[in-house]
Amino acid sequence: MKSLDQFVEICQEAGIQVMFMEMPSANSWNMARHRAVADYASSRNISFIDFNMKDRMKETGFDWMTDSRDGGNHLNYSGAKKISVWLGDYLAKDYQLEDHRKDSRYQRWQQDVSAYDRIVLGTVHQTADES
């Protein structure tokens, strides 16, 4: 806990907002862990997002039957996409992060995503201009 306290202190002194989150995990997460993290986060004014909570699952559209690849420990592509889209919207809104998808300086990243989608998923990635 001492290392975590030091990490949080360094971030807060540097003006870096700390956020904790827990990905959906039916097998390795429980309410005792949730409460411990929530209490720690609350005591230090840190945001905590637990994607295992029913309200968060409803917001993301997450479904254990279609969005997990091994019965609840890891997300599949569909689950990762749902969580990533929700998290991206949250970070843009609550942390004022800029959307760089149309920024030419990030073109290489977009090309890498498109290549990944073609090779691994057999799909074509939609660019920010097309969405």
Feature locations, PLM:
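Conserved, well-ordered alpha-helix/loop/beta-strand core segments that scaffold catalytic motifs
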Residues: M1-E59
